[in-house]
Amino acid sequence: MKNVLLKRAAAVFAAGWLAVASAPAAHAAEPLPKLSVTVFAPPSQSIWIPALIQRAGLDRKHGFELVVTPKPSNVAYTDFATGRDPVCFCAAIAAVSRFKQQGGNFTLLWNIFNFESDIVLRDPAINDPKQLEGKVLQTDTITGSWALSKWFLQARGVDLGKVKIKSSSARGAAGLAELQLGRIDALLVNPTEGAAAVAQGKGALHALPVFDKAVWQKAAGTDFVPSITFGVANDWIAQKANQDLARRFYAANRDAAAFIRDNPAEAARLVAKDAQVDVAALQTVLERYRDLMRIEPLRKHIKTVALLTQKLLPEGGQLPRPLTDAELDSLVSNFDVEAAHE
């Protein structure tokens, strides 16, 4: 009888020990929370950081799994503005401000990219944007990049009434073909596309930067323009679990941006396939624009956003009217993304 009791006690102890020992393993096996984000389809620069986060495992480092969905710019903006996509990694201030005026239920958490764009040309004699007058310029006019480019071109003395603007959402090779065939005179694109086009042109193409630091410092008193931001639906960020996800994603963003600045060659190798850009061309962009990525809470720059949305963009015709103070406060989130995540 004694032996039977001892065996039963041993069995109970063993079962309890196994349960305790297996608990950490079971906990470790629990799936990570997923964060699904929309980006512009490649070769948009909005795919760089999410792709690097995935390739370098920075999402898992910060305790979540990132899912990236590339979409054409018009689809991405429509889905974000209507709430179909609650998370957008391609929310250009100049573009989504229009949606805010129309009652859009979203807010912007942090800046991702400063404004930069390039004008790619065949004619070597064109070395000043004013020489675009009388020419055909192709670009994607639905994007915030175009809205800011338009403001800079006008500020630099270009009469856009004398420039024929051809709008197209075609990216990469399609736009380059139009330029090489002589159907257009110039192509206004992001820095990645600009570098790729110049590289593929093998000496036949050159690029002019649109951003002018002196012009901007005179207008704003700062050295950069917040441009592409991380936007979320208000209902989404109101949920505690999503607040934690947003903070984890912000930390991963900061890590990715630091990696790109410190290791542009390796970053280009990791991201080029997703970005659909030649490794060498992408490396050139990352080295040329080391300060292009500026991951900071947008609320820190609300005065600059106010200047953009309440003065410069409306005066330039890129917004139908200035944002009201209430719209501005709603547009630029005061959610603390830098607080420690759980």
Name what the model sees in each region:
Residues 61, 134, 211-223, 291-300:
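Short, solvent-exposed loop/beta-turn-alpha elements that line the ligand-binding surface or hinge
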